[in-house]
Amino acid sequence: NKGIGLTFMTKYYNEQVETASRDQMFYIQSLALTRKIKQVYENVPLYRQRMQEAGIEPGDICSVEDLSKLPFTYKQDLRDTYPYGMFAVSMDEVVRIHASSGTTGKPTVVGYTKRDIEMWSECVARALVAAGTQKNDYIHVSYGYGLFTGGLGLHYAGELIGATVIPVSSGNTARQIQILRDFGSSVLCCTPSYALYIADTLREQGVDP
C-alpha cells in the first residue's frame, strides 16, 4: 500500500476524511461511537457494570453529544482488570499487544486487532503528511521499538505513505547522528526533548544543526 492517491507535495493522506465538513465529521464520529458503545457493553464486564450503575443502555448513546452521559474510566480500573480484562474482542482476534512502561504500577495493556493496526497506521500517516512528510522522504525513527507503540506506529505509517523508513530505535546518540548524516534522513521522529539533545550534541561537535 503506497498511500491513498499520495503524490509528491500533497497536504493530505486521506483527503476525503481529513477535509470532511463539520456535519460529516459529526456523523462519522457518532456512527463509530454508537457501534463501539454497543461492542464494549456486550464484551467488557466492567463497562457494562458501570453503565448499568449509571442507568445507561447502549441505545441511550446516539451521538458524540451524549459522551457526557458515560461514566469515567479510572487508572485503577485498568490495574484491576490487568492484563486482558478490558479487551472488547476475543484473544483470537488480537494480533499484537502493546503496553505502557508501568512505572507507577502495573502496565496499561492494549490489544490490537489487524484492523486496529491498519487504522492506527493511517492515523499516524495523516499526522506525518500534515507535518510535511512526502513519498520521497527518508524517515529516521528514534522512538523505541517494543511494547511502547511509538516506534512501530511511525514505522508502518511511513511505509503507508511510501517513504523510506529507517528504524533506528532509541539510544546511542552518536550513532543516531551518524545515521542522520550518512543515510540522508529528511524527517526525524523522536520526542522534542531528544531532538533538542541531538541539536546540542551537534553544536558540541561544532556542527550547526
List each language-model region with its residue ranges:
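Short, flexible loop segments at the rims of nucleotide/cofactor-binding pockets, characterized by
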Residues: 116-117, 143, 163-168
